[in-house]
UniProtKB/Swiss-Prot annotation:
One of its GO terms (biological process) is cell adhesion. Residues 113-123 have a biased composition (Polar residues). It comes from Escherichia coli (strain K12). It is found in: Fimbrium. Induction: Repressed by H-NS. Keywords: Fimbrium, Signal. Residues 1-23 form the signal peptide. Disruption phenotype: Deletion of the operon under classical laboratory conditions does not result in any major effect on E.coli capacity to form biofilms compared with the wild-type strain. The operon is cryptic under classical laboratory conditions, but is functional when constitutively expressed. Part of the yadCKLM-htrE-yadVN fimbrial operon. Could contribute to adhesion to various surfaces in specific environmental niches. This is Uncharacterized fimbrial-like protein YadM. Belongs to the fimbrial protein family. InterPro entries: Adhesion_dom_fimbrial, Adhesion_dom_fimbrial_sf, Adhesion_dom_sf, Bact_Fimbrial_Adh_Pro. GO terms for cellular component: pilus.
Amino acid sequence: MIKTTPHKIVILMGILLSPSVFATDINVEFTATVKATTCNITLTGNNVTNDGNNNYTLRIPKMGLDKIANKTTESQADFKLVASGCSSGISWIDTTLTGNASSSSPKLIIPQSGDSSSTTSNIGMGFKKRTTDDATFLKPNSAEKIRWSTDEMQPDKGLEMTVALRETDAGQGVPGNFRALATFNFIYQ
């Protein structure tokens, strides 16, 4: 139980009623201590480029619409999210995804409507752990997450992922250039 003595209350009231309390400028100096760092996350893989500001581009080679419609391996690309420099106190990493989700296929991210560089229609991209099926696509803008295993958190391993181009409406895909933005978010514990 905290006991408050009367003289402390008087001092507090004197401070609260002082004209200096109503000043328009307040400067605060403080010292913060960071107890644990997080991790540096990079994206690696064939056809992956980094612009130097941790913005990555993954290019999937040109293919026919039939490859996307038939969900062949040519319509997807593998990459890894690699964690390095993690604090020893980090026991897990969760990954979530944000992007412009398709209304008809909410697990697929589609191009922004104002992006004139993307000329496809009814095509989106989905993200999943490598070697899993399309039912495991990570739903953007949701609480769905992928929790990294202890092994995947090692700098020489990483979280192996696949991005796949798929029709948002079966049989309705229109070929062209595809460009969409996905943002991976990381939560550490």
